[in-house]
């Protein structure tokens, strides 16, 4: 007679792909890197002003670097959209807003980095927008990403 429960007998799939899915395709890490780079670029704009920031730090090259984790976070954010656990409806709304923000930023940054090759487009956004992102939006997004939990991945995911 066997007395072991199904939980103990359960063999977890330890493949690389399974680990990748179980960790939400590493969306959290990509999103935090993306927002972290955004903090650096917006902080440069606020501290140095548009003229200095655009000449030295906010460049097409830095925008292309930002675009890599941003695109990855946008794609994986959409993939894990239904697998994220939320404690409150507010948490769900903030997570969805963060994915929409990141995914919506990709076309703008593709345009800046590969089509117009002109980062001066960022001056279209008033300086208060950078302050809003730095003081309110980015801290909320980073906190949300830090607390992110996923539902167990199923074979159909």
Regions found by a protein language model. Name each.
Residues 31-77:
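Hydrophobic transmembrane helix segments
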Residues 24-32, 38, 42-45, 71, ...:
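Alpha-helical membrane-associated segments of multi-pass integral membrane proteins
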Residues 1-39:
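Cytosolic juxtamembrane helix and N-cap/initiation of the first transmembrane helix
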Residues 4, 13, 28, 67, ...:
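Short amphipathic alpha-helical segments that mediate assembly, nucleic-acid/protein binding
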Residues 48-63, 106-133:
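Interfacial non-cytosolic loop connecting adjacent transmembrane helices
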Residues 17-27, 58, 62, 84-94, ...:
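Membrane-interface helix-boundary signature
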Residues 75-111:
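Loop-to-transmembrane helix junctions at the membrane interface
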């Amino acid at each position: 007679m066997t007395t072991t429960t199904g939980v103990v007998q359960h063999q977890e799939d330890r493949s690389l792909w399974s680990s990748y899915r179980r960790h939400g395709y590493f969306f959290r890490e990509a999103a935090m890197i993306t927002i972290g780079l955004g903090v650096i670029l917006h902080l440069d704009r606020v501290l140095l002003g548009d003229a200095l920031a655009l000449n030295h730090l906010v460049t097409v090259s830095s925008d292309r670097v930002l675009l890599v984790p941003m695109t990855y976070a946008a794609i994986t954010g959409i993939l894990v959209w239904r697998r994220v656990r939320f404690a409150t409806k507010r948490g769900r709304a903030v997570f969805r807003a963060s994915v929409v923000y990141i995914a919506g930023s990709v076309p703008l940054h593709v345009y800046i980095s590969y089509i117009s090759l002109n980062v001066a487009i960022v001056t279209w956004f008033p300086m208060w927008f950078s302050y809003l992102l730095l003081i309110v939006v980015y801290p909320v997004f980073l906190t949300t990403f830090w607390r992110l939990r996923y539902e167990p991945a199923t074979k159909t995911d």
